Amino acid sequence: MKQQSAKINDLDLHNWKEYTDILTDSLWLIGARDKSGAHNNKYHGNFIPQIPNQLMQRFTQKGDIVLDPFLGHGTTLIEAKRMGRHGIGVELLPEVARLAKKNIDSESADSPGICSEVIVADNSTDKAKSGVVDALKKIGGENVHLIVLHPPYHDIIKFSDRKEDLCNASTVEEFTSRFGDVIEAFSDLLARKRYLAVVIGDKYTNSEWVPLGFYLMQETLKRGPRLQLKSILVKNMVNNRAKLNQENLWRYRALVGGFYIFKHEYIFVFKKN
């Protein structure tokens, strides 16, 4: 007899060959971003909906609760709502949170009774954590079942002048440590044997490749002691807005400078023991 309590997704593995849309390789080659429904790419720095979609198909069931501590314009919660998952998001900037709530509210829910809660707070503070706990109570749960984190790639994009904003961290070390504060704040709310994913890219500064992805991977393992690294996924980057219509210029710069052009980002997948 199948043990339903151990199941973390809605996949019928007796018919596993039917799931041709689900990625199982560590190299993710994804085309144009999904712009259906409430999804859009007006917010510079938001990630493509296909990432949370893939993660939710693999690691959640309908009715589960998904947490995004770096909500932005709401991509994760939009996708959660359309897939029948409850969503909780934390956003530092009130004006961005308002737009996120508007986007999420405009999306149709896959199932009745789906809740989407947006909390305006610094995600490393007690206020943010207590807000998430209150949202869990409102939904009727004690833990979240998936955490998706897509932080700023340090100072590549300046989202605000707020000192609490990770894009304003003065050093890579400060950026990494403050990201660890977020892991520490929320990893204990993750249900046992459930998953946490970090979506992050690297940067190039002062003629040096800065491996932000691996720094955050190590910090996640350090600050979330019950987390186990399960996968390192490499996803292609296409139509990068910062390099749009400048392909030849960047190719020339790469040839002159002896470096390679960023065409990938990482998705680090962890499981809570």
Outline where the language-model segments fall.
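Class I S-adenosyl-L-methionine-dependent methyltransferase catalytic core
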Residues: 1-273
